[in-house]
Amino acid sequence: MEGELVFNTSMTGYQEALTDPSYAGQILMFTFPQIGNYGCNKENYESEKIQTKACIVKEWCRHPHQGEENFDEWLNREKIPGLEGIDTRELTIITRETGTLRAVISTDGKITPEEGVKRAKEMEWPSDSNLVAEVSTKKTYKKGKKGPNITLFDWGVKQSIVTNLAEKNKVTVVPWNYTIEEIKKTKPDLIFMSNGPGDPDHPEMKSVVENIQSLVKEYPTIGICLGHQILGLAMGGETYKLKYGHRGGNQPVKDVKTQTVYTT
């Protein structure tokens, strides 16, 4: 199994993280020392399946106090490789110092460490592909029965976002590459650009950015995660890949004017 190795510092929300389409193409490693403490339930999914290539933990909880199944049973049912017994915090420090790594996980015992390193070096970065097209909805669907009309670009949206918006709005979820004409037919009061995986500056996303450039002149727009980056590109900004991603809760945010750091 090959993938981009990333880490998450949250203490809870392991199911939400693993089913988040933003992690498509990646191997997710948790820094919290034990994962699966409260079991696994279908209600915690952010999409229809686990989106990561694999999962790495220091230890998984054998006897959770609740849940329909334990962490290992869940990964097996979803056919996702899991690796236990790794000092994930030490590996996270290495990742933080060297930058995001490409990784290979082997289960057959036939691949030597040297062969694994070679395969990792030859591996393409997941963001070289158009991951948005892979995780986006293939057809339009609607949620919510009252309130303003929100047209939501699904670039890998978490279902909790759709659910929360639908509580007080009428939400139309559309595929990643919906055209300007198709968007206008949905009669939006607001355009919402979702989270998602990959590179916002990917060549196949150029037309999307151009569409947003036109739409922001006519409609109120909101972007979150990847959507925020796409909106930035549409407004003339630039994006670049961080040395390592910031994934987890309580992210520090620095006010560059006052030099004050806030915890979100």
Segment roles from a protein language model:
Residues 190, 194-263:
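Cysteine-nucleophile active-site neighborhood
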Residues 1-163, 167-181, 185-186:
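RNA-binding accessory domains that recognize and position tRNA/RNA substrates
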Residues 88, 263-264:
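Ser/Thr-centric signal marking residues that sit
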